[in-house]
């Protein structure tokens, strides 16, 4: 799922030198090479389960959902803090519950192609496209899409508040493009507000190993379906586009003491789930339900 992830800028320089004294002369030694502050290899796996709840239209019954996502990227240094990033991703939704004719799964396999400015492992500005196939079962030419996003970060108050602006879109997205962004407020050394949509968060880091946060998520992805023949008979479509969304609020904690891995666990409420067949003006909504999540990230 494509979203517009953005982070704050914190620039620093480091240098070291040493001098060895002789009887009458001093010889300067070359400064050691500073360690790489940005990871080159990025790995992420996530699974999120939303428990069963009813459709707004009772004839459709009930549904639960399981979301899985795997991605791997590698950064290639261009110059300074500018990188070219390339990678792959596979994501999949599986739906259980009533056999009502709606898709029982949706999936996507895509590439990542990006140019970004990276500071301390955080993307401060960049542009990315994710070309790939977004489909139900059949991989075909009309299942190809290329979601894109562009973003930039700027200081509003030195070392305290930053503004983020961004846009994103896709060929089969509705609307075809949408804004994102917000502000980052460094409240203290341990507390910050990342008011960045589509994934705002209030983050507390008591130390280098623990990360606690209250989060929100707006997740929207469009897929090419096969036959959609619902039991209520108002929705009978072939080869249609559906924009599926899951919007959540919750809390999560992460532990990064096992370098280079970060282990993440979270829970909350999926407040809205929806199958939006926008070209046919048909939406199928599902009531709120609790969710649980586990994830693992690695940067090296």
Positions of predicted regions on the chain:
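Solvent-exposed loop/turn segments connecting transmembrane beta-strands
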Residues: 59-64, 103-105, 135-143, 168-177, ...
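Outer-membrane beta-barrel architecture
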Residues: 71-73, 112-116, 149-153, 182, ...
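Outer-membrane beta-barrel translocator/channel fold
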Residues: 61, 92-101, 198-271, 275-276, ...
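Outer-membrane beta-barrel "beta-signal"
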Residues: 181-185, 190, 253-259, 286-300
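Residue-level signature of outer-membrane beta-barrel architecture
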Residues: 74-76, 117, 154-156, 169, ...
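Transmembrane beta-barrel domains of bacterial outer-membrane proteins
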Residues: 22-147, 239-248, 281
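Repeated loop/turn-to-beta-strand initiation elements of outer-membrane beta-barrel proteins
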Residues: 78-84, 121-127, 159-163, 190-193, ...
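Transmembrane beta-barrel strands of outer-membrane/channel proteins
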Residues: 43-51, 86-92, 127-133, 165-169, ...
């Amino acid at each position: 799922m494509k979203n517009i992830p953005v982070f704050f800028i914190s620039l620093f320089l480091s240098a070291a030198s040493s001098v060895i004294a002789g009887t009458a002369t001093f010889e300067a030694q070359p400064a050691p090479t500073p360690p790489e502050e940005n990871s080159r290899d990025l790995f992420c796996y996530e699974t999120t389960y939303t428990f069963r709840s009813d459709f707004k239209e009772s004839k459709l019954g009930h549904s639960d959902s399981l979301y899985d996502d795997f991605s791997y990227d590698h950064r290639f240094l261009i110059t300074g803090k500018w990188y070219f990033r390339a990678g792959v991703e596979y994501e999949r939704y599986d739906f259980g519950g009533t056999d009502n004719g709606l898709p029982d799964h949706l999936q996507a396999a895509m590439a990542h192609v990006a140019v970004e400015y990276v500071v301390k492992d955080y993307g401060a500005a960049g542009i990315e496209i994710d070309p790939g196939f977004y489909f139900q079962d059949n991989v075909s030419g009309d299942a190809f899409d290329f979601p894109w996003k562009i973003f930039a970060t700027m200081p509003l108050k030195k070392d305290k508040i930053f503004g983020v602006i961004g846009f994103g879109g896709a060929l089969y997205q509705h609307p075809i493009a949408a804004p994102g962004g917000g502000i980052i407020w460094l409240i203290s050394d341990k507390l910050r507000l990342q008011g960045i949509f589509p994934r705002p968060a209030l983050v507390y880091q008591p130390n280098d190993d623990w990360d606690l946060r209250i989060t929100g998520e707006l997740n929207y992805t469009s897929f090419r379906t096969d036959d959609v023949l619902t039991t209520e008979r108002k929705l009978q479509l072939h080869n249609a586009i559906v924009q599926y969304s899951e919007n959540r609020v919750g809390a999560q904690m992460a532990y990064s003491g096992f370098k280079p891995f970060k282990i993440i666990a979270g829970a909350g409420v999926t407040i809205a789930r929806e199958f939006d067949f926008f070209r046919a003006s048909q939406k199928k909504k599902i009531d709120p339900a609790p969710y649980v999540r586990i994830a693992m990230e690695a940067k090296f």
